């Protein structure tokens, strides 16, 4: 039987009304709401398994110390083996002693917070859903109008840093210097990571870089306001990344979980560490040797939670480069598991479906 509430609830109309405020989730919190609006409600079967099961509650993703990566050949090879184990079995690992200065990490987190807590009228000047033509875009839920069943409890801004960096005036003053400085270090560290990943595949160090895996850097900076009813919603629903590789800087609030052996495992924050995870395109070109693992972020009464995700994603701009399983990694015994596809085509699938809780790789699996 249709109830009065179910008749009155129109998800599209409510999403549009929320979007037109241009104030995001923070605007709701600033209005001192005590109940989470219906568009943010997730299905109960998704929300009932938030805590890791007893069998995995003591598990943690691999933590790899990079202090000796440049010391000598033996030290580098030992780190490559640890990276190989992590990306083949977990798809995630945390890096300590990665050489990015702590003050640079703290300043980018502070810059992200400053922007999101800026005067609403200033933020509105950067609000857009035209990510294709603007270097810097602020909004809430990039997939708000996709087929995703629920809206997530977060606001974000995104910025394409490479290969064509934005002009300084395109970046808000509150986070401008921090973004340029942090991204400079991320690009350098990303280059090292792709060298180690190439070596973990038994290939030459520059193999992945030669495939343009390091060419494009997209930064997405999330702000998760405190939630009055965290048991009804999620910060980000289950998904995998449509990138080659993602570097994540998170604050001390926590909430990130990865799906490991059909159970959710907490990724506990480590001060000064970076979280690294394999994206869909690296799983594709390695023919499932490296795994792109689904993950999510819980909503929390504490907050705001700040995170900075840096995606090495080739170019989402129109280009003709085709990606498929690498010839060096396929054989009669291990045939290609995916069809060839362009970044543009895969991104179209990703943005049309949004974060709907299913793997986008399934659309191109042979």
Curated annotation (Swiss-Prot):
Residues where Fe cation binds: 239, 241, 295
Cofactor: Fe(2+)
Membrane-crossing residue ranges in chain numbering: none
Record GO terms (molecular function): dioxygenase activity; metal ion binding
Keywords: Iron, Metal-binding, Oxidoreductase
Residue ranges constituting the Fe2OG dioxygenase domain according to the UniProt record: 215-314
Annotated cofactor note: Binds 1 Fe(2+) ion per subunit.
Annotated binding of 2-oxoglutarate, by residue: 305
Domain of life (superkingdom): Eukaryota
Recorded family membership: Belongs to the iron/ascorbate-dependent oxidoreductase family.
UniProt name for this protein: 1-aminocyclopropane-1-carboxylate oxidase homolog 12
